[in-house]
Amino acid sequence: MTKSNYSANNITVLKGLEAVRKRPGMYIGSTGPDGLHHLVYEVVDNCIDEAMAGFCDKILVVLEPNDIVRVEDNGRGIPVDIHPTEKISALELVLTRLHAGGKFDKGSYKVSGGLHGVGVSVVNALSVWMEAKVYKDGFEHYAKFEKGSILEPVKKIGETEKSGTVIRWAVDPSIFTETTVYNFEVLATRLRELAFLNSKISITMRDERLSTPKEVTFAFEGGISQFVSYLNESKQVFPKSPVFIEGEKNDILCEVAIQYNDGYNENLLSFVNDINTREGGTHLEGFKTALTRVMNDFLKKYPKLVKKMDKEEKLTGEDVRAGLTAIVSVKVPEPQFEGQTKTKLGNSDVRGIVDSFVNEKLTLFFEQNPNEVEKVLEKCVAEAAARIAARRAKEATRRKSGLDSFGLPGKLADCSLKDPESCEVYIVEGDSAGGSAKKGRDSKTQAILPLWGKMLNVEKTRLDKVVNNEKLQPIIATLGTGIGKDFNIEKLRYHKVIIMADADVDGSHIRTLLLTFFFRYMPQVIEKGHVYLAMPPLYKISHNKKEWYVYNDDERDSVLDQIGRGNNAAVQRYKGLGEMDGTQLWETTMDPARRKMMRVTLPDAVEADRIFSTLMGEEVEPRRKFIEENAVYANLDV
């Protein structure tokens, strides 16, 4: 691996650490589960910085008992010598001062994903204690900290041939009051992503909290090409292997991997220095522009396909990205982030660099693989035809109704209040359950939309079919946001969208189909926390004129034990919502003071995309494998 003289001279100090414990949310976003896991990412980001600089190829993350985390790498080791101006050990400086780190010295790090020094010092400030071991220059060094302050100054504790850094800590439960328990799968998802983005490293994660420790290693020599294959694993794809494009100009490294599948949804991920740029930015704009241009240029070479297009009609960006899985990853020395969550790249020069590389390399690939380009163009042209058909249908509806969109559906029992924040809509399967819900609701704030007809699996369907589906059309009209590129979250008519289906296998299937629709066509409704699942009771238990509604088998057994097994309690299992009258439905499922609901969240869009594709796609084997591996976590009818 690369060698470099990395010492205290490379550490630059910007300001102190005082405010972190007082206002932790300013530094890690929240003190809930997201913030807790963010601490691990901050420490791992330092290891990744070492890897991107060429000094580290192995990272270990260990979850120990008692909510302790240990992160190790085999990099150069954080400097331990005395800083020339601060007159303390560089290790102490990095871990106790905000904005102290090698990232700010261009000689030490060309590009940086995490905030080297910033991240670790914040973790230190929010921990009850932290230990640091550094293997460097033939010696093992040790220091201990308490709530961000030095407790045991840096000292040599032995000789070693190793190099690297070990950071071990226990978070402060007085700050993380919601939970201090780490979720293995949440961490594994991010570590897997980092391993895909950095093909020369391996990341091992071990859970020592279990009686039999669980260990998984992520190492992907294929890098982002392998990432695309992973995302497409349950789909029929072309070309067989993803197209990989890379290039470097003005110290900006660009990598792109693309592959089409037989679906209709685009899955476009972009990263800057390993940071997921969820809001996109100039690198993504450059990619999209080049892709659309290349496709239109090649279309001219296929007259039979041109004939299928309307005159003067060109392929749009939406046409060429339907069924596309692509990853755009750039490494930028000084990224400028914009947007609401600072996850949008603003560097204008990156747009042209990505555009140029994609245009040149994709053109070359298509020239060398004419069969592949014809397959792709056939798909793009079919998508254009569907888009034009959907547009004409929408225009016809508009002329006919005099409305900008579909009118509100006839079966919708709307609420009287018009303030979206106070209103909720129950999407209910079947007219009988819809009737009970209408009778039991609070008509001031609760709207009821009964669904009828065949539910569509949007994972296998084009936009024009989705827009015209008899079951989805009323949902689109009721929510008021529009879908696809017309979507506007500000027009959402209800801030709680509650899916209410039977507590059986058919109900689970309907819930999954509806969630797939929201994820594919209205993802912001989920991201903003507006989608909920109603939790109707599974059993009603009656005894001595008393009634209990219970929601699972464990609760049923607990109530029966409480009554006494020999006391002839009557147990009714609800097969469907229609078996309850309006009063029962209100008391058990709709009364805000008593009901149980589950909010649908989207902590990781990448993994959610893969799971929806696996569960709702055409391929049977990946679905079977997923269900077998995850049966312990869900009640599935296999």
UniProtKB/Swiss-Prot annotation:
Mg(2+) 1 binds at E429, D502. It is an enzyme of class 5 (isomerase). InterPro entries: DNA_gyrase_B_C, GyrB, HATPase_C_sf, Ribosomal_Su5_D2-typ_SF, Ribsml_uS5_D2-typ_fold_subgr, Topo_IIA, Topo_IIA-like_dom_sf, Topo_IIA_B. Mg(2+) 2 binds at D502, D504. Residues 423-537 form the Toprim domain. One of its GO terms (molecular function) is DNA topoisomerase type II (double strand cut, ATP-hydrolyzing) activity. The keyword Cell membrane does not apply. It catalyses: ATP-dependent breakage, passage and rejoining of double-stranded DNA. Binds two Mg(2+) per subunit. The magnesium ions form salt bridges with both the protein and the DNA. Can also accept other divalent metal cations, such as Mn(2+) or Ca(2+). Its main location: cytoplasm. GO terms for cellular component: chromosome; cytoplasm. Few gyrases are as efficient as E.coli at forming negative supercoils. Not all organisms have 2 type II topoisomerases; in organisms with a single type II topoisomerase this enzyme also has to decatenate newly replicated chromosomes. This is DNA gyrase subunit B.
